[in-house]
Structure formats: C-alpha cells, structure tokens
C-alpha cells in the first residue's frame, strides 16, 4: 500500500498525478488500466487543486493506493465540503454547444470506475475510487 502526502497542492496537479502513476501499485498495471486510472485521478486532482481550498490557502491532499484484485485509490483533503457524486449529471444527449459547463469529468469517472464513494469525516472530504483489475 502506498501512502502519499502532498502539501502545498496549488499548482502541483501534474506532480501529484505523476507520483500516483509511478506508485508500485499503479505502475504494475496493464497499460489500458493505467490509462483509465490516469483519467480518473486527473479529474479528481484537478478538482481538488482548483476548487477545494481558498486561493490563499496551501491545502493538502493525501492519497492511499491499494492493489488487490481491484485498485483502490482514496483521496482525502481538508477543503470545503463537496460531494461530487451529488452534482447534476450532464445531459449527454445535447450537443456540446448546448450543454452546461462542468460535470462531464465526474460523469466519466463514474462510468469508468466500478465503485466511487464519498464521505465527509472529521472535516475532510474522502473520495474513494475502485476498479477491478
């Protein structure tokens, strides 16, 4: 199990994603699995680094990665409470010009992962994703 801690996180999205993808758990996956995990992790990281904390706050992001018969990645931040799973799903039947901005990344995340869970515990957002591998 890999435990990663990042602080500060502002402007560090690429470094955070690279560290996750280079973890022994993720790096040992098949290329197709890595690409799906990359998409999911990138969406979560961008949301946390862009929106979780006020502009002048450093903030932190903890990431726990565990590989068994499934990959489990747990993201924990101390930002404002935000459950991405409660957001309105985008209307994918509309053309992109008519579709409202936002929500497509989380929509894709939910479609690509086998399980996505959110909890707010002890003033922390905890988002866990799982993918059978």
Language model feature labels by segment:
Residues 13-14, 34, 38, 58, ...:
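Short, structured helix-loop boundary elements
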Residues 2-31:
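Helix-loop-beta hinge of the Bergerat
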Residues 1-3, 49-133:
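Conserved beta-strand-loop-beta-strand hairpin that lines the nucleotide-binding pocket
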Residues 20-42, 46, 98-100:
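Conserved short strand/loop->alpha-helix "switch" segment adjacent to the catalytic nucleotide/phosphoryl-transfer site
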């Amino acid at each position: 199990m890999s435990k990663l801690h990042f602080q500060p996180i502002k402007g560090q999205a690429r470094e955070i994603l690279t560290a996750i993808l280079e973890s022994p758990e993720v790096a040992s996956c098949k290329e197709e699995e890595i690409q799906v995990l990359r998409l999911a992790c990138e969406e979560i990281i961008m949301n946390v680094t862009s929106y979780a904390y006020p502009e002048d706050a450093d903030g932190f992001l903890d990431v726990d990665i565990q590989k068994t018969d499934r990959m489990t990645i747990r993201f924990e931040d101390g930002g404002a409470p935000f459950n991405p799973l409660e957001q309105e799903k985008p209307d994918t039947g509309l053309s992109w010009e008519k579709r409202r901005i936002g929500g497509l990344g989380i929509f894709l995340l939910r479609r690509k992962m086998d399980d996505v869970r959110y909890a707010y515990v002890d003033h922390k957002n905890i988002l866990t994703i799982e993918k059978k591998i």
